[in-house]
Regions:
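Rhodanese-like catalytic fold shared by cysteine-dependent sulfurtransferases
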Residues: 1-20, 24-62, 67-108
Length: 108
């Protein structure tokens, strides 16, 4: 299964590389954090089978959850099995935030 580091994702963002960034944190965790990685689109991890076919296939998709473990890795594996270039963010949102990378307030 493919993964991407915090530094690599920051480089991709700085280079304006084309990719889809999906926040797949559980609703309660996401709302408690009240922030997200800029450019991310939230998808409910509990509903993956209702939205998986809507993920663009023409570019890499990067997924992040709270810590970069079960949720993002499981969904990345599902998308990869469908033929998508799917990667999970190592250390997830907590690693991104701890590294001092930019975040934005959740859109209301």
């Amino acid at each position: 299964m493919s993964r991407i580091s915090i530094c690599e994702l920051a480089e991709w963002q700085a280079a304006d590389r084309m990719f889809t960034l999906l926040d797949v944190r559980r609703t309660s965790v996401r709302l408690a954090d009240a922030t997200e990685i800029p450019g991310a689109h939230w998808r409910d991890p509990e509903e993956v089978f209702t939205w998986k076919d809507q993920v663009p296939r023409d570019r890499p998709v990067i997924l992040y959850c709270a810590k970069g473990h079960e949720i993002s890795q499981g969904i990345a594996a599902t998308l990869e099995a469908m033929g998508l270039d799917a990667r999970y963010l190592i250390d997830g949102f907590s690693g991104w935030h701890s590294a001092g990378q930019p975040t934005r307030s959740l859109s209301r």
